[in-house]
Amino acid sequence: MHNTNDFEKLWQDIGTHGVMVLSTCADNRVTSRSMSVTVIGGRFYCQTNKDYLKCRQIAQNPNVALCFGRFTIEGVCRDIGKPCDNEFFVKALGKAYPDAVSRWSSLPQECVLEITPTLIQSWIYENDIPYIETWDFSESTYAKEKQ
């Protein structure tokens, strides 16, 4: 099991938003791109055009990865509809990235992607010794391993 504080600290360290690299894969092709991401209730959200390659790849394979700072995030992604149908998302995105809302949220092909994390890892150093922290959401566990 885990200590609740381990997961609370994780979300504090991740914060409410960030520019993150989203990686998707289908047909043995991995692609990555930077996305403006908001973090709400332990999930990651971004918006994009539903006709873009990333959405076609997610339709074939919903397993995705995000990377930013010292964090790597593995998760399952799904299209939850248009930004206008997800007011909680538009409100959060508008606080962090107001230009993104004004430029793209009302476009007809725009959709919101929701990523539910399954595993998050982070490199940390304590007294110049490297460790990998792992939060496993499917097992509800936290571990810190010396490297």
Model-inferred region functions:
Residues M1-M20, E139-Q147:
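Extreme N-terminal tail/first-helix region
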Residues M1-T4, R29-V39, I132-W135:
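Charged, low-complexity, helix/coiled-coil-prone segments
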Residues H2, F71-Q147:
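Charged, gly/pro-rich active-site loop segments
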Residues W11-Q12, S36, R56, R103-S105, ...:
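Short secondary-structure boundary/capping segments
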Residues Q12-G15, A59-Q60, G94:
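Alpha-helix boundary recognition
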Residues H17-K50, C55-A59, V64-F68:
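Short beta-strand segments
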